[in-house]
């Protein structure tokens, strides 16, 4: 089934989606191995198999990760397994669909982003090490364009186009979904491109920015956050979230436009950011209310030495 499914999705899904299926397939094989099995008959795939696979994922610590998978990550793997098993069911390789009574449940999570103040502090901080400055600049470019790390690392001068407005745009295809993305370049983003135009590493690689591995970039982001006094966990996902919230939606850009700039295939994905902003407004209003209430409770001091002049 795994081999058939892998062959079927070749060339039909984005590379990132295919890679995710491969990761799920590897976990299924590890789960079988943990039960001293190399393979299993499709007829033995039942509701208990799904429950046991879920338990295996919940307790499994992926290599190089400090903790087990989150609930939502586990659900994503089970979702992908369901697609494979339902394919077998529709091909009539299975008499019953083991997932007919299964319900995937996802926990609502807030997407962290940098506030305007945090973004400004990060942009103006002077780093003593060039490697940290470089990764900070990559992060900032993502904050001002919404371009993901995977796509950012591949950008070349050929991705810069001149629009009808005579302004420069980044035009690229998202690696994750293969969606065409066109993003107008703001002055900050243009300055960052210009900064690295003649950098020795970009001249060798032919890219807009000096290339760096994802692992190393994430390692340096931790140092950057510590140096800037940020308690938030800096990631390139957060940079995209910052573009969606602080840079665009907070400044009145329509959600449909933001969705297009981010390369989302569904506007529902972008609406998550709008809900995050609504929650922040609610929290800020609650804080303001607390301040106003504390002021109203403060006893007023009598004014001494007051004379009435007639």
Roles of regions detected by a PLM:
Residues 108, 175-194, 202-223:
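C-terminal catalytic core of Y-nucleophile DNA break-rejoin enzymes
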Residues 159-166, 231-232, 252-272, 279, ...:
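Short, polar N-cap/turn motifs at the start of nucleic acid-interacting alpha helices
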Residues 67-71, 75-79, 90-149, 167:
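Basic, Lys/Arg- and aromatic-enriched nucleic-acid-binding interface segment
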Residues 199-203, 288-310:
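C-terminal secondary-structure termini that scaffold catalytic or DNA-interacting sites
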């Amino acid at each position: 089934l795994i081999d058939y499914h892998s062959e079927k999705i070749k060339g039909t899904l984005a590379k990132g989606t295919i890679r995710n299926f491969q990761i799920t397939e590897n976990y299924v094989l590890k789960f079988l191995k943990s039960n001293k099995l190399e393979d299993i008959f499709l007829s033995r795939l039942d509701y208990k198999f799904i429950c046991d696979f879920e338990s295996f994922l919940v307790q499994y610590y992926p290599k190089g990760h400090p903790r087990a998978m989150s609930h939502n990550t586990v659900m994503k793997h089970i979702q992908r397994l369901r697609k494979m098993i339902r394919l077998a069911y529709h091909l009539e390789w299975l008499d019953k669909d083991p997932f007919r009574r299964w319900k995937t449940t996802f926990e609502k999570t807030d997407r962290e982003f940098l506030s305007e103040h945090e973004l400004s502090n990060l942009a103006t901080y002077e780093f003593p090490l060039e490697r940290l400055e470089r990764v900070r600049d990559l992060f900032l470019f993502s904050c001002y364009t919404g371009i993901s790390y995977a796509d950012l690392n591949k950008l070349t001068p050929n991705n810069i186009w001149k629009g009808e407005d005579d302004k420069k745009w980044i035009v690229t295809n998202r690696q994750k979904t293969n969606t065409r993305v066109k993003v107008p370049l703001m002055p900050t983003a243009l300055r960052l491109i210009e900064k690295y135009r003649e950098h020795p590493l970009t001249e060798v690689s032919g890219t807009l920015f000096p290339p760096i591995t994802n692992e190393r970039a994430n390692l340096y982001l931790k140092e950057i956050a510590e140096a800037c006094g940020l308690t938030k966990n800096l990631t390139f996902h957060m940079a995209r979230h910052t573009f969606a919230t602080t840079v665009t939606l907070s400044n009145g850009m329509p959600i449909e436009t933001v969705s297009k700039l981010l390369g989302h295939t569904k506007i529902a994905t972008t609406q998550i950011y709008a809900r995050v902003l609504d929650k922040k407004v609610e929290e800020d209003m609650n804080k303001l209310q607390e301040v106003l209430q504390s002021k109203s409770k403060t006893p007023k001091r009598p004014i001494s030495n007051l004379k009435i002049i007639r």
